[in-house]
């Protein structure tokens, strides 16, 4: 079996060696650029780890695994455009380096390339894999729409937020786990348990992102802390702060949310102090651990020896306790 680091190395090598021979090059240069920016490559790594539970040649499914990374980066490219974000992983975003029209066209082409790469899977499983990938892509769009709609609401409930991040983030990790298992000819029950494992891990990962945006170390996290607070993004932290705050705390939160002219550091400090007094930091940690515990139940139900599952569990544990 491969370690997660060995798999990550294979993924990066495969992506770095991808060629784009079609023209115009101006359409494909932004695609190469986006995929060259690195990242954690969680989705292809999970797919290959899932496959490797059952078979020892995960390098044979690098194309469909990297299809997920292509798709994920397509969503980031369009997210950056919608958010007018200037940087991604410390580098200029596509719409800044080129322009908005290029970001749209190159992003659309990445979506097509993702399906082309996924279609290179074993023909025996092509129909099932493409059906799952298509449904997942639609769910992610639904999650993004909910996310945008939540920006105009101060009454978002925790369960609504969890469903939004399940759609926007979690289902792609679940899809990665399931496709890996399908391509490895895993038993149907194991396939479904691995999907649920990925779903629960995805929820934990997203809540960890919410938490780190407030409480992470900026030197390790890779970006300034408090970005979500500054732009009033509806996160697990903010939603539960509104839901749990007393009248005084709620009034203070509303003041900062409605304030248009403010000092960034002052707002981040004030809202973080409110989070601390309300206790949403502890709530987030408890919820992250809950989803990880749920994920462990599903992986425990997979009918394989524990030593066969050890690398996948260790990888998930490292990601859960990451500081970036």
What label would you give each PLM region?
Residues 1-324:
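All-alpha prenyltransferase/terpene-synthase fold signal
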